[in-house]
Structures are given as structure tokens and as C-alpha cells.
């Protein structure tokens, strides 16, 4: 369990690796062009973000799940049986078990001046690059409860006990704060296929207040 949490914390850190360069590149591109297409439009809109669509198996899991709330943030998910509470703080939320997987959510509060749209576009571009390199098997814009973000699923790890993740990153304005939301569902690579429907059902059940 500690190994999975350590790897997940590392992934949060790696999310920001090279992000400064991506921000500069996207910012430069935006300043030099007055036109846009599907790869460069502002991430504040929702037109280019898909909405979750559950399979039959995922719907069954979600229908039988129990809602769990993150009191300090107002966010909630529906969790199946076997996903106990581990640790919940103001900016972190951890539920799960080695048998089924882990839900690891974190909040990062950004300055009001932080370019959230540009940052999210850079995250998307970086994820597409990982997709090209075979490190991710799925990348898309995904709207969760009215919040646009980037969703990706990692490719199988080289070893069976390596960590594999289903992840989503987005931004919201909440109680006067500009917040980055980082949601990770993870388990060992050999268990991922068995849990992937549960991971999707959990992620897509997310309710995100904006105020």
C-alpha cells in the first residue's frame, strides 16, 4: 500500500515536470495566432470535452455503490463495497485497499493569476505525447459534472506488480480559490483489467460543486 501511495505522489509531481516549458510553448502559440482549432481552443469551453458514458457493467457497479463525501471540498464519489476510508484531509482524500485499488484525490490551490486554461492544455499535450510513446493507452478531454479536464489511462506496466493508473486532472473555482483537482485510481498492473470498470464507475460518479 505504501508503495502505491508513494508512486501516486510521485506521479502528481511528475505531472508538473516540463509543465513550465509547455506553458511557455502554448502561451507563445496563443499570442502569435488569432485563429484556433480543436487542438488549440481555450479549455474554458466544454464543446471539445466528452461527457462520461457508462457501459452496462459500469452502470451496475455505480448503481450498487455508496456515496462518499469529501467534507472540506464538497466533492463526492460512489464507491463499491470493499473501498474503506484510509486518510482524509483538507487537500487530500484516500480510500481503498490493496485487494481492489485506491482512490487518491488531491487539491492544489493556485494563485488567481495562474493560467489554468493554458496549464490544462499543456497537460493534454503532454498526455498526447505519452500516448504516442506507448506509455498511455487512452487520452481525451473529459467533462466531469461540468468541469473540463484531461483523462488518461496508463498502458500496462513492464512488471505485473508495477502500478497502473486511471487519472483525471481539471480546474475549478471554489470558495474563492483557483483549484487544480487531481484524481487517481490505481492498482497493480496484474489487477487493473479486473478493476477497470470499477475505476471508471467511481471516476464518472464524481460530483464537483462550483461556487
Show which residues each predicted segment covers:
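N-terminal targeting sequences that direct proteins away from the cytosol to non-cytosolic compartments
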Residues: 5-8, 15-102, 162-163, 177, ...
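A short, sequence-level motif marking secondary-structure junctions
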Residues: 82-85, 108-113, 170-173
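A short acidic-to-branched-hydrophobic micro-motif
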Residues: 96-122
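Second-shell loop/turn segments in exported
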Residues: 108-114, 139, 188-192
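Signature of long, low-cysteine stretches enriched in small and polar/charged residues
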Residues: 125-176
Amino acid at each position: 500500500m505504501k508503495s502505491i501511495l508513494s508512486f501516486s505522489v510521485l506521479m502528481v509531481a511528475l505531472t508538473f515536470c516540463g509543465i513550465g516549458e509547455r506553458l511557455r510553448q502554448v502561451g507563445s502559440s496563443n499570442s502569435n495566432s488569432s485563429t484556433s482549432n480543436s487542438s488549440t481552443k481555450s479549455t474554458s469551453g466544454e464543446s471539445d470535452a466528452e461527457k462520461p458514458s457508462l457501459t452496462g457493467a459500469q452502470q451496475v457497479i455505480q448503481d450498487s455503490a455508496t456515496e462518499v463525501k469529501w467534507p472540506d471540498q464538497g466533492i463526492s464519489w460512489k464507491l463499491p463495497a470493499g473501498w474503506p476510508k484510509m486518510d482524509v484531509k483538507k487537500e487530500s482524500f484516500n480510500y481503498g485497499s490493496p485487494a481492489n485499488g485506491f482512490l487518491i484525490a488531491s487539491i492544489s490551490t493556485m494563485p488567481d493569476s495562474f493560467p489554468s486554461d493554458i496549464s490544462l492544455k499543456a497537460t493534454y499535450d503532454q498526455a498526447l505525447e505519452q500516448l504516442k510513446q506507448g506509455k498511455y493507452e487512452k487520452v481525451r478531454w473529459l467533462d466531469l459534472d461540468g468541469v473540463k479536464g484531461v483523462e488518461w489511462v496508463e498502458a500496462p506496466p513492464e512488471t505485473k506488480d508495477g502500478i497502473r493508473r486511471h487519472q483525471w486532472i481539471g480546474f475549478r473555482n471554489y470558495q474563492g480559490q483557483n483549484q487544480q483537482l487531481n484524481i487517481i485510481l490505481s492498482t497493480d498492473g496484474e489487477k487493473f483489467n479486473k478493476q477497470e470498470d470499477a475505476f471508471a464507475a467511481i471516476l464518472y460518479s464524481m460530483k464537483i460543486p462550483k461556487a
